[in-house]
Every structure is written in C-alpha cells, then in structure tokens.
Amino acid sequence: MQILVYDNLDEKQKEEALKRPAISAKDEISKIVSSIIKEVQEKGDKALIEQALKFDKAEISKIKITQEEITQASNRLDKDLQEAILVAYENIKKFHEAQIPHEIALETTKGVKCEVLTRPIEKVGLYIPGGLAPLFSTVLMLAIPAKIAGCEKIVLASPAKINDAVLFCAKLCGVDEIYQMGGAGAIAALTYGTQSVLKVDKIFGPGNAFVTEAKRQVSSDINGAAIDMQAGPSEVLVIADDLANEKFVASDLLSQAEHGADSQVILVCLSQDFAKKASDEVQSQLELLPRKELASKSIANSRIIIAKDLNQALEISNLYAPEHLIIQTQNPRELLKGVKHAGSVFLGAYSPESMGDYASGTNHVLPTYGLTKTHSSLGLADFSKRMTVQELSKEGFLALGKSVEILAQNEHLDAHKNAVTFRLESLK
C-alpha cells in the first residue's frame, strides 16, 4: 500500500490522495441497458427468459418462484446457517422497529392544528445480486424494514438459479413474491411490470454497472420507479492510533477490499512505524485469502495516510466522507463527536465492519462515493413517506387571515388572496 505523510502533500496532492475511482457509466453500457429495458417493456416475460439464458446461462421456463421451491430451499439450507441468520434477523428487526416514527400534532396558533403523518410506500421491489457470493444478508437489510414500515407488497428479484439462503431469508422476512431474473432486465421488469412481475413504486438493492445504470435510467423516467440510492464502489476508512492492533486493522481493510477490484480502502494512522506494520500485515493476510486476486487489485489502489494527530485524522475522514468509518483508538467515542460524514461508524477494537454488514442490527445499505455528506444509511424512513395535515377552526382562520392576505397580495397571487378574502367576508 502507498504510504503518504499528509503534511508533506500540497493541496493538489491531498485532493489526489482522497480521490475515488471514476464510476461514470460508459456510453456502451448505457446503450446496452436502454436496449434491455426496451426489450422487457415490449416482450415481458419472454424477454426475461431469453435474458436469463443469454446473461446468466440459466434455462428457465417461468419467472415466479413457487412456495414449494421456497420450502425445498429452506429444507436444504445448513441448520447452523439458518440459526446464524435468525440471530441477525432479530437484531436488525429490533434496530429498525426503534425507528418507527411518532406522529406529530400541535397547534401553531390557537385554532390552527398541524400534523405530520407517515404512510408506507405501497409496492417495493428488492434486487439481490447473484454470482459466486450471493448477498443473502441484503435480503434481511431490505425486507425487514419494508415489512416493519407496512409496505403492502414486497417482491424480490435475483438471477436464476436463486441461492437457497436468499430464498430462506425472503421467506423469513415475509416477502410476497420472488422472481428469478437478474441484471438490467430485472430492474426494467420491476419498474414497468410484466405478465408475471408486479410493477413497483420503488426499487432497492445493489448490483453491477448494468444494474446501477438501469436504476439510473428508470428513476429518471416519469413513468418509471423511484430508487433507494445510486451505488458506487464500496469503501472503508480506518482511523488507528499507535496502540491499535495491526492485525485487526489489516483484517478490516481486507474485508472491504475483497468486495471487488474497485473497492477503496484507506488507513489514516499517526506514525511511519504503525503504517509499516499495518501494510506488512495486510500483505501477510492477503496471501491466505481465497479472493486474493480480487482483493489485491483493490489494495494496489489503496493508501495509508499518516496524520500528525487525531484531529487531523478526523479532518481527513470528514473530507473523504466514507461509506464505512472504523475508529480503532484508545477513546473512539471521543472522536465520534467530531465525525461529520459517514454512512456507518464502527467504534473500538471489537467493532469490525463485518458486524454491521451482518448482525449488529444497523443497515449495511449505505451511501458511497462521498454521498454521506448529504445522504443517510438506509432505514425505515426510506420505505415510507410523510404528509402534512392542517385543520383550522374559524378562530384559527381569523387569527391568520389578514396576514395571509397580505402575503399573497405581495406575491401577486390574487386567487390565493381571494381564497382567504371570500371566507373572511362570510364570517363578518
């Protein structure tokens, strides 16, 4: 890993040190995705079946998974894995139930009652990628809050053949329908509906460049679907002092690096000595990983930054605004006060990112690419929307009437003014 001393860098070099890999969609990907979306709109299920063979090398005759198939998958699943999933399920459920909003009702002026009500999004679609490492944990992260929020219909899509653990988690969380379809075609089907697939209002879940581009395209279509967030490559920034355990730090860096070659890991520490120890430990652990080749590409593009003190380390972290922030210092909670931007924060030696990824209870769907400056981690609020209510008595109307007439008149909105004036005259 490249080691940089922050105070030795000029402003341009500092900016370069915290630069992320480019994620702009290539024109070729955009065109392919547009073509796939159009194909699904025109041919429905037939297009999805053809795409399963073309892209996933899967021969299927139907899109919707039956209850019998779900039961069989659950029966095949290793019992230890089932129990581990149940532990995660309970913690995620507890944490998201605590986010249930309270209704707000108050009088702003005597006789003027204002309220905030929360209502669930009716139909949501959850996308779970396939591949060698099926993200069944993401089913929990998406379906549990959807269920707690009260969404009327929760459907899930994943490429054929769907992993048994994905089906087990979907059943556990009360997902209504499961579709074996993947990629941009799945996003199109969830957006516009097909003979078998329910058209949804909002789509959640990660994916490759084609899925990400498909989500971008459908979310910009007035007849399309809303999406959770635009996803970039996964990332972690670790702040460590000289007393941190370099073995723990290295394992945290590598647990992020193994996600993919474009994942970014940054260590901010306080000395050359610790930087060297951590870098050596990363190389030692890397050699033993099954996904060594993938992780090594990420590590090659990652860096260690030496800060003069913890205040500067925080400054660097806030400039970067990481998806995951791990603080391995003697008093991590003290540093938390200065954290301005992060998707999820992990405090102390025994809070590895893996805990949040799976079972602590927090959600692992997080904004990336610096979006933590303006966006939040996924939560219950993402599966619902708020509406305001106002109710004025005659007394309340009279109390505000004259002021609203003046405000409307000065904005030259005569009909607005008349709506008040006519009522005031009727009360004389």
Swiss-Prot record:
Task: State the source organism's domain of life.
Answer: Bacteria
| Record-listed substrate binding positions | S234, Q256, H259, H324, D357, E411, H416
**Any keyword NAD?**
yes
Cofactor annotation comment: Binds 1 zinc ion per subunit.
Q: Which UniProt keywords apply?
A: Amino-acid biosynthesis, Histidine biosynthesis, Metal-binding, NAD, Oxidoreductase, Zinc
The residues annotated as the active site are E323 (proton acceptor), H324 (proton acceptor)
Q: Which GO terms describe its biological process?
A: L-histidine biosynthetic process
Q: Which cofactor does it need?
A: Zn(2+)
Name the EC number(s). 1.1.1.23
| One annotated Gene Ontology cellular component of this protein | cytosol
Q: Which InterPro entries match?
A: Ald_DH/histidinol_DH (IPR016161), Histidinol_DH_CS (IPR001692), Histidinol_DH_monofunct (IPR022695), Hstdl_DH (IPR012131)
* Record: residues binding Zn(2+): Q256, H259, D357, H416
What pathway annotation does it carry? Answer: Amino-acid biosynthesis; L-histidine biosynthesis; L-histidine from 5-phospho-alpha-D-ribose 1-diphosphate: step 9/9
GO MF terms held by the record: histidinol dehydrogenase activity; NAD binding; zinc ion binding
Q: Which reaction does it catalyse?
A: L-histidinol + 2 NAD(+) + H2O = L-histidine + 2 NADH + 3 H(+)
CDD domains xref list:
Histidinol_dh
Write down the Gene3D superfamilies for this protein, in alphabetical order: 1.20.5.1300, Nitrogenase molybdenum iron protein domain
Pfam families referenced in this protein's UniProt entry, alphabetically: Histidinol_dh
Report the top EC class in one word: oxidoreductase
The record describes the protein's role as: Catalyzes the sequential NAD-dependent oxidations of L-histidinol to L-histidinaldehyde and then to L-histidine.
Describe the family membership recorded for this protein in Swiss-Prot or TrEMBL. Answer: Belongs to the histidinol dehydrogenase family.
Protein name, as recorded: Histidinol dehydrogenase
